[in-house]
From Swiss-Prot:
Protein name in the entry: Metallothionein-1H
Similarity field: Belongs to the metallothionein superfamily. Type 1 family.
UniProt binding sites for a divalent metal cation 6: C37, C41, C44, C60
Binding-site list for a divalent metal cation 4: C33, C34, C44, C48
Source organism per UniProt: Homo sapiens
Amino acids binding a divalent metal cation 3: C15, C19, C24, C29
Binding site for a divalent metal cation 2: C7, C13, C15, C26
Transmembrane segments: none
Length: 61
């Protein structure tokens, strides 16, 4: 699988847990590129920036 994981929005892909995808917007890939976002974060965008603590980031307050 391409590590950039550039799949279409709403499509389907197989992002692994170690995927460092930057453009993945497919519905089947629940993992974002920001490891500090909580699993249920609806606002979480690809490439959001973590702020210090592992549970805080720029897109999930």
């Amino acid at each position: 699988m391409d590590p950039n994981c550039s799949c279409e929005a709403g499509g389907s892909c197989a992002c692994a847990g170690s995927c460092k995808c930057k453009k993945c917007k497919c519905t089947s890939c629940k993992k974002s590129c920001c490891s500090c976002c909580p699993l249920g974060c609806a606002k979480c965008a690809q490439g959001c920036i973590c702020k210090g603590a592992s549970e805080k980031c720029s897109c999930c307050a």
